């Protein structure tokens, strides 16, 4: 296993990222490492990597449109109005107790936004560049550790789709998990349904809830001050700006936001939704048509890093899939070397973690592992619920805490608006510790005792 191209390339990726090497460069080096160890050769590796870059183009374009839309919203003044209302509320009730409760209220609201983005209004991470940046000044005043915010957002983006069969959860549970497990277990007498999957995933999700509570109330509870180079606007400055905001600007912003999300839900396209929102802003006079170029340029600057990471991650995943590493990794578990039931469960979960971090998608991991995991679990005597839990957790592991995952890139896109939130150390590492470790522990417990 230690000579497997997937394992080594993931180790290289994580090591370089932790050394603060740019994530894009780390992904390129990790891809070259995987190709070299996987015997693809330099030329074939480069061709495979570049051939896979197009797979991330749509996501990068989505980020660019969202960036432009976020800039347009800020021009409308609605974000300043929200900040003003919150700041004046804070100034009226400045006691430590009230500020603490207010901090946790913000956490709860952000968690609800994130959960809704997966299940109720499945817009995924599209809400983050719109909702989070206006709150940064509030975070600074409250001295909130943004790592806690990253953990809150990532929890909502990951925990709910593996538990609740609604929205993206319906796709993951019903269309992918249940379907693939039933196909793999058809000749083995194992058939499952949505209710069983939700039951099997309940204990692992409880582990994630404990990880979230640990992050909020223990690890990142203490105040954290950020070195802000630009002097933040005072309440009087904001009041002067608020006085110039017209009611039609607020109405236009609300219409644009609703229209954007509604269009995305109907068309399943963030690009079309964002364009509709921008058109509404132009028609309502929030910015002139000739200013659209500046709006897009600012949006690109805002989201360029995130978009290029997704493009590079797509090329890296293409190289991983071109090697035999993923198949070898999964099949190594069925070689008969492992005799202990507990060790087998742990190894299956760890392999799932590596695969998901390698190909960047828990949704894509399920079809890869089920054909081996289902018969392997049954041969070790795992119950149907335990088998479901192993497959589900093995796929979900690595979604949170991966340098190239939407679940970490999304929070970074909003929290790093002012350049004070490091993607690796402030998003990746905190979410990896607080979610992947509990998922491993509680996933193993579920496998052994369900």
From Swiss-Prot:
Q: What is its main location?
A: membrane
Question: What Gene Ontology cellular component terms go with this record?
Answer: plasma membrane
Name the source's superkingdom: Bacteria
Q: Give the matching Pfam families.
A: Na_H_antiport_2 (PF13726), Na_H_antiporter (PF03553)
Keywords attached to this Swiss-Prot or TrEMBL record, sorted alphabetically, are: Cell membrane, Membrane, Transmembrane, Transmembrane helix
Q: Where are the transmembrane segments?
A: 10-30, 53-73, 95-115, 120-140, 148-168, 199-219, 242-262, 267-287, 302-322, 343-363, 378-398, 428-448
Q: Where in the cell is it found?
A: Cell membrane
Q: Which membrane topology term applies here?
A: Multi-pass membrane protein
In terms of InterPro entries, this protein maps to:
AA_Transporter-Related, Na/H_Antiport_NhaC-like_C, Na_H_antiport_N
Q: What name does this protein carry? A: Uncharacterized membrane protein HI_0325
Q: Which species does this protein come from?
A: Haemophilus influenzae (strain ATCC 51907 / DSM 11121 / KW20 / Rd)
Instruction: Give the taxonomic lineage as stored in the record.
Output: Bacteria, Pseudomonadati, Pseudomonadota, Gammaproteobacteria, Pasteurellales
